[in-house]
Amino acid sequence: MARTDEIIARTAPGHLNDHNLIDREVESLCDGMVKYEKRPAKRHDGSVAEGIYNAWIILDNPKQYNSYTTDMVKAIILAFRRASVDRSVNAVVFTGVGDKAFCTGGNTKEYAEYYAGNPQEYRQYMRLFNDMVSAILGCDKAVISRVNGMRIGGGQEIGMACDFSIAQDLANFGQAGPKHGSAAIGGATDFLPLMVGCEQAMVSGTLCEPFSAHKAARLGIICDVVPALKVGGKFVANPTVVTDRYLDEYGRVVHGEFKAGAAFKEGQGQIKEGEIDLSLLDEKVESLCTKLLETFPECMTKSLEELRKPKLHAWNLNKENSRAWLALNMMNEARTGFRAFNEGTKETGREIDFVKLRQGLAKGTPWTEELIESLMPTAQK
């Protein structure tokens, strides 16, 4: 009987059709701020599976915490499309440069300086954003979110669109919408109720309070978490988070919650004194890629398609009217919130005076440029 590699050499077609939409390098669309790399896939024994790769899609905007610009969104769409149709790709690893941020969502500078007050432009931007989320959900390969740092706002939304998430435990998660002039309707309001239940989804989507990677694992938002902090040459759990017990004296779950007061500050000091090492994160990601490799490819794709259906159903049901609302919201609250974040500083803060705004609206005060200017953090000081 002929060997498998002999059969492949004899029967594989001499020409393969190209199913990419456009023939462009991903990096060329955004000055290299999204990188596309094919890294050799490995078997369980560590040997390279010749001709098979894992596609790494890497956000490279660390100065702005890997937030995505319009051009980066275009590149991400192209990258996922490329990985999806590449016959040699086993799995996709979606991540960011550095150890501070996976992604913090849309680029607030661009939002504040270009899209604020321009709903017709933001509506077109949201077409691209929607296509980005759909590209992740529609990828023919398993998608792993390698959470190298904080995953906030739109970053949390594109992260939850992935099939698996593995985080280093210094990473924080959460939404930012109502605190900064928006609503988390770019995927979070679709995915969170499915993943964590209605009450916890409500907490995350409205209060905008960040939570730890350990809590994300407990809630079911990520599938695994690994330490990244080394103190004295040894890995230790995030010292700002409760990880040594599950319940408090009243029976309430405290595992994964942030410590308070002096204990939290002490933990912050330990982080500053230690070193960040993402080697365990990379080992976990590589291990998962190998597990995915050792499966039938079409059965894997079908399993992904079926298991994604709850997310896809909610997403497709809401994405178009969400796009319309987000565009119109750029005339008032988003216009105000994004400007406040962009123009504010550490000294002035990056949020408006919410009580003053509510007091004004309660008296029927119209949205005017004068009102918006008066609410800016710099005006309050």
From Swiss-Prot:
Reactions the enzyme catalyzes: 6-oxocyclohex-1-ene-1-carbonyl-CoA + 2 H2O = 3-hydroxy-6-carboxyhexanoyl-CoA + H(+)
Function: Involved in the central benzoyl-CoA catabolism. Catalyzes the addition of one molecule of water to the double bond and the hydrolytic cleavage of C-C bond in the alicyclic ring, 6-oxocyclohex-1-ene-1-carbonyl-CoA (6-OCH-CoA) to yield 3-hydroxypimelyl-CoA.
Chain segments annotated as transmembrane: none
Superkingdom to which the source organism belongs: Bacteria
CDD domains referenced in this protein's UniProt entry, alphabetically: crotonase-like
UniProt keyword Isomerase, yes or no: no
Enzyme Commission (EC) number: 3.7.1.21
One Pfam family named in its UniProt record: ECH_1
GO molecular function, one term: 6-hydroxycyclohex-1-ene-1-carboxyl-CoA hydratase activity
Inducing factors: By benzoate.
GO terms classed as biological process: benzoyl-CoA catabolic process; fatty acid beta-oxidation
Name under which the protein is recorded: 6-oxocyclohex-1-ene-1-carbonyl-CoA hydrolase
The UniProt record lists the keyword Cell membrane: no
Keywords, alphabetical: Hydrolase
Residue ranges of coiled coil: none
Pathway this chain belongs to: Aromatic compound metabolism; benzoyl-CoA degradation
Alphabetical list of SUPFAM superfamilies matching this protein: ClpP/crotonase (SSF52096)
Cross-referenced NCBIfam families: dearomat_oah
Gene: bamA
Family listed: Belongs to the enoyl-CoA hydratase/isomerase family.
Record note on quaternary structure: Homohexamer.
